[in-house]
Amino acid sequence: MSLGSTPSTPENLNPVTRTARQALILQILDKQKVTSQVQLSELLLDEGIDITQATLSRDLDELGARKVRPDGGRAYYAVGPVDSIAREDLRGPSEKLRRMLDELLVSTDHSGNIAMLRTPPGAAQYLASFIDRVGLKEVVGTIAGDDTVFVLARDPLTGKELGELLSGRTT
C-alpha cells in the first residue's frame, strides 16, 4: 500500500487486518497533517481501505492519536509524546516569548506585584511590546525604558512569582 495510489473503487478495496490498517493510519499521519476523521477516512479509501467512523475513532484512540492545535493554526491529528510532535508547529507567541526572554533577559528583580526585567540597552521596549502582544493572563501590562521593563502582575500573583515565571526559574 503506498500513499498517492489510484482512487479506490469497490473492485479494488482491500481486506486488511487491524494491525495493517493502524500501521497505514500511522504512516498517513506521519506524512501529512490530517485535520479530520473524514479526511483520514478518504485518505484510507484512496489506499483501498473502507472504514467506518466508529472503527476509525477506535483506531485513533488505540494509537493514542490526539488533535494538536498550534498557536494560530489549524488542529491536526498527531501520535506520540508532545515533545516529538512537530515541535516547530507548536511554536506560537508563547514559545517565541520564551526564546526572546532567553536571549534578552539579563536579570530580574521585584517589588510588590511588579517584576522588573533588565535587558541589554535598547531592548526593553521591544521585549515589553512583545509581552503585551502575547497577552499572558498573569500580566496586566508593561512599562519600558531603555534597558528595564516593569511588568505588572495580575492578582494574586506577586512580582517575585511573575519574575520567576518569565525567567523560567522557580524557587
UniProtKB/Swiss-Prot annotation:
<dbReference type="InterPro" id="IPR020899">
    <property type="entry name" value="Arg_repress_C"/>
</dbReference>
<dbReference type="InterPro" id="IPR001669">
    <property type="entry name" value="Arg_repress"/>
</dbReference>
<dbReference type="GO" id="GO:0034618">
    <property type="term" value="F:arginine binding"/>
</dbReference>
<dbReference type="GO" id="GO:0032993">
    <property type="term" value="C:protein-DNA complex"/>
</dbReference>
<comment type="function">
    <text>Regulates arginine biosynthesis genes.</text>
</comment>
<dbReference type="InterPro" id="IPR036390">
    <property type="entry name" value="WH_DNA-bd_sf"/>
</dbReference>
<keyword id="KW-0678">Repressor</keyword>
<dbReference type="GO" id="GO:0005737">
    <property type="term" value="C:cytoplasm"/>
</dbReference>
<dbReference type="GO" id="GO:0051259">
    <property type="term" value="P:protein complex oligomerization"/>
</dbReference>
<dbReference type="GO" id="GO:0000976">
    <property type="term" value="F:transcription cis-regulatory region binding"/>
</dbReference>
<dbReference type="InterPro" id="IPR036388">
    <property type="entry name" value="WH-like_DNA-bd_sf"/>
</dbReference>
<protein>
    <recommendedName>
        <fullName>Arginine repressor</fullName>
    </recommendedName>
</protein>
<keyword id="KW-0238">DNA-binding</keyword>
<dbReference type="GO" id="GO:0001216">
    <property type="term" value="F:DNA-binding transcription activator activity"/>
</dbReference>
<keyword id="KW-0963">Cytoplasm</keyword>
<dbReference type="GO" id="GO:1900079">
    <property type="term" value="P:regulation of arginine biosynthetic process"/>
</dbReference>
<dbReference type="Pfam" id="PF01316">
    <property type="entry name" value="Arg_repressor"/>
</dbReference>
<comment type="similarity">
    <text>Belongs to the ArgR family.</text>
</comment>
<keyword id="KW-0804">Transcription</keyword>
<comment type="pathway">
    <text>Amino-acid biosynthesis; L-arginine biosynthesis [regulation].</text>
</comment>
<dbReference type="GO" id="GO:0006526">
    <property type="term" value="P:L-arginine biosynthetic process"/>
</dbReference>
<dbReference type="InterPro" id="IPR036251">
    <property type="entry name" value="Arg_repress_C_sf"/>
</dbReference>
<dbReference type="GO" id="GO:0045893">
    <property type="term" value="P:positive regulation of DNA-templated transcription"/>
</dbReference>
<keyword id="KW-0805">Transcription regulation</keyword>
<dbReference type="Pfam" id="PF02863">
    <property type="entry name" value="Arg_repressor_C"/>
</dbReference>
<dbReference type="InterPro" id="IPR020900">
    <property type="entry name" value="Arg_repress_DNA-bd"/>
</dbReference>
